[in-house]
Design a protein with these regions (language model features):
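Outer-membrane beta-barrel translocator domains and adjoining extracellular loop/strand segments
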Residues: 32-37, 66-70, 94-101, 139-145, ...
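Residues that define the transmembrane beta-barrel architecture of outer-membrane proteins
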Residues: 37-41, 48, 65-69, 76, ...
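Cleavable N-terminal export/targeting peptides
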Residues: 1-19, 237
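Glycine/small-residue-rich loop that forms an oxyanion/phosphate-binding "nest" at active or ligand-binding sites
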Residues: 71-72, 81-111
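Transmembrane beta-strands of outer-membrane beta-barrel proteins
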Residues: 19-25, 44-46, 53-59, 74, ...
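Outer-membrane beta-barrel transmembrane domain signature
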Residues: 122-214, 218-223, 231-237
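Outer-membrane beta-barrel initiation region
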Residues: 16-48
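Glycine- and aromatic-enriched membrane insertion/assembly motifs of diderm outer-membrane
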Residues: 38-84, 159-166, 176
């Protein structure tokens, strides 16, 4: 009750800083991986205070094959964003521990902690550079002795912008900081360029209502596959 009262009090005090969004997609793409396919919904809610924020992110499929619930905290200013995500994918067919939400034991947990950083050069040079590392959790070596610290770095550039149409390109590379004797990392079967993406976004206007639409083509040379995503944002505030 005390924790609930604190959360409720924070919401009442900083209600104007609460933000949320919900998207529908034909799949869930992430760092060269197709996490889920089918009718996918993803949404989040977060509380902002000055340059800091804390929130929850969830995703799932209509048939229940994919289920995910994450917590995150972050800091942002004009150019830099830093985040720490606590990620738990508890899909029914998972090959890891998907039944103990609060188990953080490194050798047993089904979750992982993901450190994320993004830096945008400037408004004139809309180039984003990003470094992301799995710092704990189910990113283990074959013997389950140590973490691999799998890392994904990428550069993203705003290629074209006219009115409300945007086209972005992204090049991503994955590797592990600690995987002696092994090739694979959390994101691909070996180190290499595992994401080449082209992303197009434009809102669809229906009366006074705008529905942001997205088209995302993603190629993964390392794992020899290509994927396409369509998305629509149902609401945001």
């Amino acid at each position: 009750m005390i924790i609930f009262s604190m959360i409720t009090g924070s919401i009442l005090l900083y209600g104007q800083e609460i933000h949320s969004a919900l998207q529908l997609r034909n799949n869930h793409l992430w760092r060269g991986i197709e996490v889920a396919s089918g009718l996918v919904y993803t949404g989040d809610i977060h509380l902002d205070y000055k340059n800091f924020y804390v929130g929850f992110w969830a995703g799932g499929t209509a048939n229940g094959d994919y289920k995910e619930f994450n917590n995150y905290i972050g800091y942002k200013n004009k150019h830099l964003t830093l985040e720490l995500w606590d990620i738990y994918n508890f899909s029914p067919n998972a090959t890891y521990n998907n039944k103990e939400f609060f188990n953080y034991n490194a050798k047993e947990t089904g979750r992982f902690m993901d450190f994320r950083s993004y830096y945008t050069i400037s408004d004139r040079i809309p180039l984003m550079l990003s470094w992301n590392t799995v710092i704990s959790g189910r990113d283990r070596n074959k013997e389950n002795i140590h973490n691999k610290y799998s890392t994904f770095v990428f550069a993203e550039y705003l290629v074209y912008k006219k009115d409300d149409l945007e086209v972005r390109g992204r090049l991503g590379y994955s590797f592990a900081l600690n995987n002696p004797g092994e090739q694979s990392n959390f994101f691909s079967k070996k180190a290499g360029f595992n994401e080449i993406s082209l992303m197009i976004s434009k809102p669809l206007t229906i009366g006074s209502y705008k529905i942001p639409l997205g088209l995302w083509g993603m190629w993964n040379p390392v794992d020899n596959r290509a994927l396409l995503q369509f998305s629509a944002q149902v609401y945001s505030f």
